[in-house]
């Protein structure tokens, strides 16, 4: 199940977001302090982390920067009533925030933004898996190439196949 972390110092905001997101089939974890949210990062792997921009002990960008170090694949969103341009730029540049959502929010926009973030998260994971598969296949090909080179050096001509004009493999001495 896809896990989402919500961090906001206002319990009413967390409750409203949980009610909005739970019906989507996502596992929603809510934290009303940065400290408790940090513990959540150690216990769970999140696809999406949504943080309030302004909280008493730390701002959301600072928290999301830390979250990025702990869970680099998780998509990060900021939710804020303070949607000034400099806040957005700071969030994007420092925490590589995927999206900046404003309070009060539009339910459809929040759900669509989180779904889009989840889709991107899954693509990132799939991309990594495919890169790992390609790397493994390249390593296997290099090993086979080394084996062919070894065989060729021990038995010159062993790796060459002689074919007739119709594609049939010819067996025997065909040098003359």
Question: Can you name each region flagged by the protein language model?
Answer:
Residues 55:
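Receiver (REC) domain active-site loop signature in two-component systems and cognate sites
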Residues 129-176:
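C-terminal output/effector regions of signal-responsive regulators
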Residues 2, 11-30:
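Two-component/phosphorelay signaling modules centered on CheY-like receiver
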Residues 39, 61-73, 90:
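Short amphipathic alpha-helix used as the core "switch/output" element in two-component signaling
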Residues 105-114, 118, 122:
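C-terminal output helix
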Residues 30-48:
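Acidic, metal-coordinating helix/loop segments flanking the phosphotransfer/catalytic sites
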């Amino acid at each position: 199940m896809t896990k989402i972390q919500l961090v906001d110092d206002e319990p009413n905001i967390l409750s409203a977001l949980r009610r909005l997101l739970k019906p989507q089939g996502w596992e929603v974890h809510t934290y009303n302090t940065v400290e408790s949210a940090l513990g959540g990062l150690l216990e769970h792997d999140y696809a999406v982390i949504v943080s309030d921009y302004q909280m008493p002990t730390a701002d959301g960008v600072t928290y999301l920067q830390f979250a990025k170090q702990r869970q680099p694949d998780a998509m990060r969103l900021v939710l804020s009533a303070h949607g000034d341009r400099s806040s957005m730029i700071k969030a994007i540049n420092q925490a590589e925030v995927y999206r900046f959502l404003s309070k009060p929010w539009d339910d459809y926009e929040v759900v669509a933004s989180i779904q889009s973030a989840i889709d991107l998260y899954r693509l990132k994971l799939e991309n990594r898996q495919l890169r790992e598969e390609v790397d493994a296949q390249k390593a296997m090909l290099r090993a086979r190439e080394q084996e062919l080179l070894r065989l060729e050096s021990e038995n010159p001509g062993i790796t060459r196949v002689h074919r007739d004009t119709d594609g049939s493999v010819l067996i025997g001495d065909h040098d003359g």
